Curated annotation (Swiss-Prot):
GO molecular-function terms, A-Z: 1,4-dihydroxy-2-naphthoate polyprenyltransferase activity; prenyltransferase activity
HAMAP family: MenA_1 (MF_01937)
Upper lineage: Bacteria, Pseudomonadati, Pseudomonadota, Gammaproteobacteria, Pasteurellales
Catalysed reaction equations from the record: an all-trans-polyprenyl diphosphate + 1,4-dihydroxy-2-naphthoate + H(+) = a 2-demethylmenaquinol + CO2 + diphosphate
Topological relation to the membrane, as annotated: Multi-pass membrane protein
PANTHER family: 1,4-DIHYDROXY-2-NAPHTHOATE OCTAPRENYLTRANSFERASE (PTHR13929), UBIA PRENYLTRANSFERASE DOMAIN-CONTAINING PROTEIN 1 (PTHR13929:SF0)
Superkingdom of origin organism: Bacteria
Name of the gene encoding the protein in the UniProt record: menA
Species the sequence originates in: Haemophilus influenzae (strain ATCC 51907 / DSM 11121 / KW20 / Rd)
Entry protein name: 1,4-dihydroxy-2-naphthoate octaprenyltransferase
Length: 308
């Protein structure tokens, strides 16, 4: 019984380290990219490609979360003073060596899933080499956010990375794998999705702003300061909403293209709360909320395309 309880506790720690509340970010961009692909080419839509895109992106997200905890632990950034939840490695439930092996396992799983995806979806050698390169870049980016001599997350570049990988590549890459074409219109929802994902990261950074500043982790929130960081958050949300709206106006055939507007009151309420917050601790429950709002907007946007 004791052994079973220990195993369950260990699995629980690994589950917490995977940060399931961040996984909607992985789903959102793939749903949107897949819906755009179906909208543009319903006859050529490949369900297996969509499933593999989802799997690969989830694995990359978990890899990034493992790497984040490992890197912050190695640099002493995650202390008991942090407002966010304590991770398995902070509690001593997972050792640095175990987490490193977890990282290696996730690299292998991401690589295998991505390779299978490319093998199924590519049409020519250019596609093969381009997406192989992007896949390797995604793995490297997931690790070097906090791991390495000069992790870019410590230089305030995390927001740009999230915009690229959860927006331009997540949406645009999925769309291309479904249609094997490029449409300039998709840049709008791709940017919108990326900005919403960046808003999730910004909430995390605003919450941990004091501890990050002490540890020398110069996130964009640390560089801007608390007030400007909250203003920046509202700008992210406003521009994201405008991107989805601009796409709907430019391409709308049916009123259903505006379904995502149903989530705008939630987005506005969230923005007001963040802007009016005075203490980082107030933002602790808001990260999961922002993640779910992002997923909801992308689901409604995707649904509008599919039934329009």
């Amino acid at each position: 019984m004791r052994s079973k309880k220990m195993i369950n506790e260990k699995l629980k720690m690994w589950w917490e380290t995977a940060r399931p509340k961040t996984l909607p970010l992985a789903l959102a961009s793939i749903f949107t990219g897949s819906a755009l692909g179906y909208w543009a080419n319903p006859q050529g839509f490949n369900g297996l490609v969509m499933v593999l895109c989802l799997l690969t992106t989830i694995l990359l997200q978990v890899l990034s979360n493992f790497a984040n905890d490992y890197g912050d632990h190695q640099k002493g950034s995650d202390t008991e003073e942090r407002i966010g939840p304590l991770r398995g490695i902070q509690k001593g439930a997972i050792s640095a060596k175990e987490l490193k092996w977890g990282l290696i396992l996730m690299v292998m799983a991401s690589f295998l899933s991505g390779s299978f995806l490319i093998g199924i979806a590519y049409e020519n050698l250019s596609d093969l080499f381009a997406f192989a390169g992007l896949g390797i870049l995604a793995i490297v980016a997931a690790i070097t956010y906090t791991v390495g001599v000069k992790p870019y997350g410590y230089m305030g570049l995390g927001d740009i990375s999230v915009l690229v990988f959860f927006g331009l590549l997540g949406v645009g890459g999925t769309y291309y794998l479904q249609t094997h074409s490029i449409d300039s219109h998709i840049i709008l929802p791709a940017i919108g999705s990326g900005l919403l994902a960046s808003a999730v990261l910004n909430i995390n950074n605003l919450r941990d702003i004091e501890q990050d500043a002490k540890a020398g982790k110069n996130t964009l929130a640390v560089r801007l300061g608390a007030y400007k960081g909250r203003v920046y958050h509202c700008i992210l949300l406003s521009v994201a909403a405008l991107c989805y709206l601009a796409f709907a106006v430019a391409t709308a055939i049916s009123w259903t293209n505006y379904l995502f507007v149903l989530a705008m009151p939630l987005l506005a309420k969230h923005a007001i709360f963040v802007y009016c917050s005075q203490q980082p601790s107030e933002l602790r429950p808001i990260l999961a909320q922002m993640s779910m709002i992002s997923l909801l907007i992308n689901i409604l946007f995707s649904l509008g395309l599919l039934i329009g």
